[in-house]
Regions:
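Central regulatory/effector-binding core of bacterial HTH transcription factors
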Residues: 1-54
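A late-sequence structural motif
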Residues: 7, 151-189
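Short beta-strand-to-loop elements that line the ligand-binding cleft
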Residues: 23-29, 108-117
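Short beta-strand and adjacent tight-turn residues that come in two discontinuous sequence segments
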Residues: 29, 43, 47-49, 114-116, ...
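Hydrophobic residues within well-ordered alpha-helices
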Residues: 38-39, 98, 123-128
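Flexible hinge/capping segments at coil-to-helix
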Residues: 54-90
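Beta-alpha-beta core module
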Residues: 55-60, 65, 126-168
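Secondary-structure junction motif
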Residues: 84-105, 172
């Protein structure tokens, strides 16, 4: 979903212009669903953000981003009141990271909204309905970092990786990686 919201349309457009003979079948889903599909060989390649413990030595890192706590610029949330958490659905590792962080720091919270999509999470946070944990690069202009989250220390980093089966020829894998990196100036390895 991270890629689909920002880089995917440009990637698909450029890829098809440069490689009209290559047919792509693209599915967009949250990390844990993609990993399940990959393990079941429903898909041969996954491009997804993962935290270090989930990264395999065979994964190819595209770029790294930090997770940050984000809120609407219009609203403030004190840690003395139950924190409204806007989160992704259970197939997203960011949800687990957010809940774990709040529970480790003994912060009272409730899930004010759950969405399977980045657009849903960002929209609800922008409306002032709560805070969320997302990649720094996905924060919108009407959002800002949640200052109270400094109490939690530095949030985790995520790495956007390519995971591909041996069914994907090395030449095609390299082609996809090269095309993705060309769209990410300053973020690529």
């Amino acid at each position: 979903d991270d890629l689909a919201s920002n880089q995917l349309p440009a990637f698909v457009h450029e890829f098809h212009l440069r490689h009209p003979g290559v047919r792509l079948e693209i599915r967009v889903e949250q990390q844990l669903a993609l990993l399940e599909w990959y393990d079941e060989r429903v898909i041969d390649m996954a491009i997804l953000p993962l935290e270090q413990p989930l990264i395999l030595s065979s994964d190819i890192e595209l770029w790294q981003d930090e997770l940050i706590w984000v809120k609407s610029r219009e609203r403030n949330y004190a840690l003395t009141e139950p924190v409204p958490l806007v989160t992704f659905s259970p197939k997203c590792t960011y949800r687990d990271a957010a809940i774990e962080c709040l529970e480790v720091h003994d912060i009272d919270y409730y899930i004010s909204m759950e969405s399977p999509s980045l657009a849903g999470v960002r929209g609800i946070v922008s409306s002032g309905m709560g805070v969320t944990l997302i990649n720094r690069g996905l924060m919108t202009s009407d959002q800002c970092e949640w200052p109270e989250a400094k109490k939690f220390g530095k949030a985790r980093d995520v790495k956007f990786v390519v995971r591909a089966t041996s069914m994907i020829p090395q030449k095609l894998r390299n082609l996809v990686i090269s095309e993705l990196e060309s769209l990410l100036p300053g973020k690529a390895r």
